Amino acid sequence: MSSEDLAEIPQLQKLSIPHGFQNKEAASSPTPSITLSQVPDLQPGSQLFTEIHLAKIEKMFEEDINSTGALGMDAFIKAMKKVLSSVSDEMLKELFLKVDSDCEGFVTWQKYVDYMMREFQGKEDMRKSQYRLHFYLPMTVVPL
């Protein structure tokens, strides 16, 4: 996924991605199954997707990183609670498990950003593939 592809996504035009979205492996992996509608603060245009909040989340990753360069589940939940205080621990645990798609037991800032980008790409692809049926009124019954 190139930066040109990302620029076409309206929800992501306000989103700046620190350190770039360069992970080709993540871009080619399958679209995740999470629905952002499950978490109120994870809606497009919500507080999670402002540059200020992304910067805060990145700072939390950098501050709370252990010697492996990643956050375990408890540290992830604690860090995310500082920024997304209205989200339940259960929802953050679910988010952690979905971001940690390779089941290593930890997430990095890059994995988090890659996950969010794939999620928005999947939502945008789904939105583009949907179409509306147009019914013309008055409707007529066509005998078979």
From Swiss-Prot:
The keyword Protein biosynthesis does not apply. It comes from the Eukaryota. GO terms for molecular function: calcium ion binding. Keywords: Repeat. Residues 52-86, 87-122 form the EF-hand domain. The keyword Electron transport does not apply. Transmembrane segments: none annotated. Signal peptide: none annotated. InterPro entries: EF-hand-dom_pair (IPR011992), EF_hand_dom (IPR002048), WD-EF-hand_domain (IPR051242). PANTHER family: EF-HAND CALCIUM BINDING DOMAIN 8, WD40 REPEAT DOMAIN 95. This is EF-hand calcium-binding domain-containing protein 8. It comes from Homo sapiens. The lineage of its organism: Eukaryota, Metazoa, Chordata, Craniata, Vertebrata.
